[in-house]
């Protein structure tokens, strides 16, 4: 196996200069750690992470360190697609807070590790709309329909069907570490 200095690998994996840091741990099998420790940014911010997931070989392990208040849904959905397609085994480590899109990212992982005092916050989408009246109504109807599909597809790991209905109706859910573990 080729020895790669950490800063050389970081240069290779961080082509945009400000993407999430990806750390490679040389071992018999490939092991990577990706930190999600700020707001979930625009989709292009995660190009290197998505590339890592889509090109990972079987036997590769990837750890997502999650401590974030959430962010862009389109980025979460891009990461989710790559998580569904990857051959790697991905573990989500809830380090402290997983809110909104960050909580959904945790639920998209294959395995979970929940730190003591970690918290989880679930809610539906936040957005704004503008334009002509009929256009705004069509957009709101579309986003409402899409949001329901996303909620039912992702939150089913932690919320019952009745709780999913309440979430869609506007209720927010907050869970502490012991509650998260019980539900997962």
Across the structure, where does each feature detected by a protein language model lie?
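N-terminal organellar transit peptides
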Residues: 1-104, 108-184
